[in-house]
A protein has these predicted regions:
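An aromatic- and glycine-enriched ligand-binding surface/loop that stacks and positions planar moieties
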Residues: 22-99, 172, 202, 207, ...
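Long, intrinsically disordered, low-complexity segments
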Residues: 121-124, 196-198, 219, 265, ...
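Conserved, well-structured interaction surfaces
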Residues: 42-51, 55-66, 88-169, 182-217, ...
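Bacterial Sec-dependent N-terminal signal peptides
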Residues: 3, 16-41, 159, 197, ...
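C-terminal substrate/ligand-recognition segments
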Residues: 106-111, 115, 362-461
Length: 544
């Protein structure tokens, strides 16, 4: 049975938790007496300065949370790629052209979802800055050893949010104080912010607890040392991208010439990836024998999951909306849930999985619903007219309005085990949302070895053998395919395509946008509203 994670107590501080800056920096007034009470002892300091920050890891409204909700980080990383598509189905899913705009890379500088994502990331950074200031204020009045650990955890969490900003937006403001007026914030280069994130993780990781964050208990859902080391490996893996301040000139730094100090040793980017992947391995993580264990109802016991968003329909408001919006209405109804009949796999996904051939990857049926579907008792699901519901994967396109398969085109999201006890249309479920897992550690290491001129076959095929997929040689091409096969629907595709230099290429239903061969769409624009507030911010190249 899932146990509550400790920061649920932070609901009593909801008003304090809203202390972020209006438009990422403007502090709201608060009651001083209440604030002093909130930090009067070490336990309260932890709850209010550290644990309260985790209320923002998940979410229930658009653009909030690292995953689980719509029109936020996950959608920007998924529906802008060859992994997923939200077809227009007659009067459904056009939404003012939003989903087509993502898929076609035609989002513009006034996109509400991009702005809301920016504001969400800076909201949590603002809260983190305030927490660090509060922790520093109480130095000498509480246990200093505990304060060091609290500070490290908040710094690591803030670094995680800056990592997403570097990945999504490139050149962004580096805000380290809760009191700086919004108009005075200067813009930093992508590399400057990246270097800051690296330093923060280097300095904070040794002070973090070594517990497995996915396991219920004191550190459930929190940033621990293995989580930080996973993020470190991810930062090093993308070093060529994140240290490039001009991503439109066709020139990238070489990872073999980017160096990091790791435990006193100078290692290039690829060696650094290997070192931190090995560190995560030594922490005791391993591949689960059954791929689906990682996404099961009550998946807290997974030996593979490293960082998760805790889910408990009776305790938390965190939602998983992606299954809900993908399943056909009748399909979801057959589980006693609701659905919105939306998101589907692309034609490119079907080709990568070799769907419809004898060589289909074993993970296809674990990640997608295709063809005839059944309820949990094995009964065929039917449409309202009594005919059998059958998903037609190859009929998917950007606009299928008025087609005979308008409502049934496309393979749908499966991935997570059905929790038929879920509430709020099934969006409140017991399956923790998986952010980081050990299979990624193995594939990161394999890729780093290949990029460094080494052999990465062992790590690649450990992942493949788990699902009885045939042996493959580790090359950059096979590794990119493997990441699609292994991490379908997990929110990594955009970052992977950018790193492999393939994000702007054309594919089914998506011609290359004029001018984007330069790479300008590999980052999103700084929202125009934010730039109007702060004249110091220069728009990213290619956007007007």
């Amino acid at each position: 049975m899932k146990r509550s994670f400790i920061y649920i107590a932070c609901f009593l501080l909801l008003s304090l938790a809203q202390l972020s800056c209006d438009d990422f920096l403007r502090e709201k007034p608060r009651d001083r007496i209440f604030e002093e009470e909130a930090y009067k002892n070490l336990s309260d300091l932890y709850l209010n300065a550290v644990a309260s920050l985790y209320n923002n890891i998940g979410g229930y409204s658009d653009s909030q949370g690292l995953q689980g909700t719509g029109r936020g980080i996950y959608d920007l990383n998924t529906f802008t790629t060859d992994e997923a598509i939200m077809p227009t189905r007659g009067g459904d899913w056009y939404d003012g052209g939003f989903w087509q705009g993502l898929y076609l890379h035609n989002w513009g500088v006034n996109n509400d979802a991009i702005q809301a994502t920016w504001e969400y990331l800076y909201k949590v950074i603002g809260l983190s800055n305030k927490s660090l200031e509060r922790i520093a204020q109480y130095a000498g009045t509480h246990n200093d050893r505990e304060l060091v650990a609290y500070e490290a955890e908040v710094r690591a969490l803030r670094a995680l949010y800056y990592y997403h900003l570097v990945d999504l937006f490139g050149n962004v403001p580096l805000v380290l104080s809760s009191s700086m007026p919004v108009k005075e914030v200067k813009q930093s280069t992508r590399q400057e912010v990246y270097d800051f994130v690296v330093r923060e993780l280097q300095q904070s990781a040794p002070e973090l607890n070594t517990a497995h964050s996915n396991l219920p208990g004191t550190y459930y859902g929190r940033i621990t040392r293995p989580v930080a080391h996973f993020l470190w490996a991810k930062l090093a893996l993308n070093a060529e991208v994140y240290t490039d301040n001009d991503w439109t000139d066709g020139i990238r730094p070489d990872g073999r010439n980017i160096y990091f100090n790791v435990d006193g040793e100078e290692l290039n980017a690829w060696q650094t990836v290997e070192a931190y992947c090995d560190s995560v391995t030594k922490s005791g993580y391993r591949l689960e024998e059954d791929y689906t264990t990682n996404f099961a109802v009550f998946n807290e016991s997974s030996a593979e999951n490293i960082f998760i968003i805790p889910m408990n329909k009776n305790l938390y408001t965190n939602q998983m909306q992606y299954l809900f919006r993908s399943r056909h209405y009748n399909h979801a109804k057959a589980y006693g849930l609701s659905g919105e009949n939306g998101s589907s796999a692309t034609i490119e996904v079907l080709k990568t999985f070799a769907y419809g051939t004898p060589q289909v990857d074993p993970r296809f049926d674990k990640c997608y619903f295709a063809g005839i579907v059944y309820d949990l008792k094995g009964n065929v699901v039917r449409l309202d007219d009594g005919t059998i519901l059958e998903y037609l994967p190859w009929e998917v396109a950007l606009d299928i309005s008025n087609e005979p398969y308008e409502k049934t085109a496309g393979a749908r999201m499966k991935k997570y085990e059905v929790d038929d006890t879920g509430t709020k249309d099934g969006k409140l479920m017991e399956n923790d949302i998986v952010l980081y897992r050990y299979a990624d550690v193995l594939l990161m290491k394999s890729e780093a070895k290949v990029r460094n001129g080494e052999n990465g076959d062992e790590e690649l095929n450990r992942v493949r053998s788990r699902v009885a997929a045939p042996y493959r040689e580790a090359t950059l091409n096979t590794l990119l395919d493997e990441r699609q096969l292994e991490f379908a629907w997990e929110g990594w595709r955009r970052q992977d395509l950018v790193r492999f230099g393939l994000f702007t290429r054309p594919y089914s239903s998506r011609p290359q946008l004029a001018g984007e061969a330069s790479g300008y769409t590999t980052v999103f624009p700084i929202p125009d509203k934010v730039r109007r507030m702060n004249p110091n911010l220069v728009q990213n190249p290619g956007y007007k």
